[in-house]
Curated annotation (Swiss-Prot):
Pfam family, one: VWA_CoxE
Main location: cytoplasm
Annotated source species: Shigella flexneri serotype 5b (strain 8401)
Similarity comment: family membership: Belongs to the ViaA family.
Gene transcribed to yield this protein: viaA
Subunit structure of this chain's protein: Homodimer. Interacts with RavA.
Any one of the GO CC terms: cytosol
Location in the cell: Cytoplasm
Record-given protein name: Regulatory protein ViaA
Functional description taken from the UniProt entry: Component of the RavA-ViaA chaperone complex, which may act on the membrane to optimize the function of some of the respiratory chains. ViaA stimulates the ATPase activity of RavA.
Database matches in InterPro entries: Uncharacterised_CoxE (IPR008912), Uncharacterised_ViaA (IPR023481), VWF_A (IPR002035), vWFA_dom_sf (IPR036465)
Amino acid sequence: MLTLDTLNVMLAVSEEGLIEEMIIALLASPQLAVFFEKFPRLKAAITDDVPRWREALRSRLKDARVPPELTEEVMCYQQSQLLSTPQFIVQLPQILDLLHRLNSPWAEQARQLVDANSTITSALHTLFLQRWRLSLIVQATTLNQQLLEEEREQLLSEVQERMTLSGQLEPILADNNTAAGRLWDMSAGQLKRGDYQFIVKYGEFLNEQPELKRLAEQLGRSREAKSIPRNDAQMETFRTMVREPATVPEQVDGLQQSDDILRLLPPELATLGITELEYEFYRRLVEKQLLTYRLHGESWREKVLERPVVHKDYDEQPRGPFIVCVDTSGSMGGFNEQCAKAFCLALMRIALAENRRCYIMLFSTEIVRYELSGPQGIEQAIRFLSQQFRGGTDLASCFRAIMERLQSREWFDADAVVISDFIAQRLPDDVTSKVKELQRVHQHRFHAVAMSAHGKPGIMRIFDHIWRFDTGMRSRLLRRWRR
């Protein structure tokens, strides 16, 4: 069976021009124009997807099969090209019958051309083949356009679905162009409207809890540059100005507030003799607020000192992936569950914006894992957000799972985040010592997001930083009142 790609090569049909015309028409469609105006960040992401569309269209045209009738006509045309004029005259009746049987668009015109000329000359032979070739080119071009039109409809339908999804999630997950591009890539999965409403729901909840959102942003920015001092430095001299009492007689230079009784102004001293103002006098004396004369009796001089030269290398700490462990015990249900899920959604937003990875582990009696920044990140996020917190608390298993993950090369610079109320049993000694080793030797950092004010200090002492977000009723009312 003849392929369309082979036919295009044989007839010198330019498929690239047809593909470019189709893509330009697609990008100029009213649906995309409105979408680009509403979500400018996603415009660049969709434009970056054009090479993939172009390659998919090329592959579709390359693999497409030519209809049997057109294949047979092309084969007949190729054989006719090899015939001399006398041979062509002999084969002409059979060629005309074949064209008629195949319902070729060239059949009627070919018969009219032959009937209009009583003698078949070499020039007529050449003209017949040229017009036949033009007819085949028109048929091949039409076939290309039909296939591209089918692909355009399918591609437009796919793009519209992804635009709907990305448009809904862009305000929630896309903080910059990088995040918008990754969001567009993740929108390629087969998702229904009811599925991604989980993300919309928790995005709205996160907006209602600005303190929780700020907490996630602070945690995301927590790995800043640090200075590393060098101890093998030499001494250097430096000059500084020091203030010393002057040897010249003092002179009145103005007024000041102090507790210097010897230099009190007469009005201040007069209040001491009034019974009603006596306590006021002593109060101002204690607070050094009595008006006194300011005397000029100090001078500055230059002093030469020595100090070690300390060079500092400013080592920008890489912002690595997030490994987030979420407590799914019964005590983390209700409002705690909403806050934990919304916090993970905020970390996902940060990971998309900064091109980082975000790996979620739910710990109770077993470990469930989700990667929110991968190609299937939206589907993984939906599955995570639809989970219910009804298990037990096994914090030791959580730490063991984190430490196992940190051993791999791709997670060597990850930050571990544990979200819990930390109402649990103490950690085993082997877990505690292993965590301290990771902190000391490999510079891994462990963050705690405490959802309760009653977490056990013995457990939380192991973390490098504790981010507190009390979900108690009193704290919730105070936050609402401050807003």
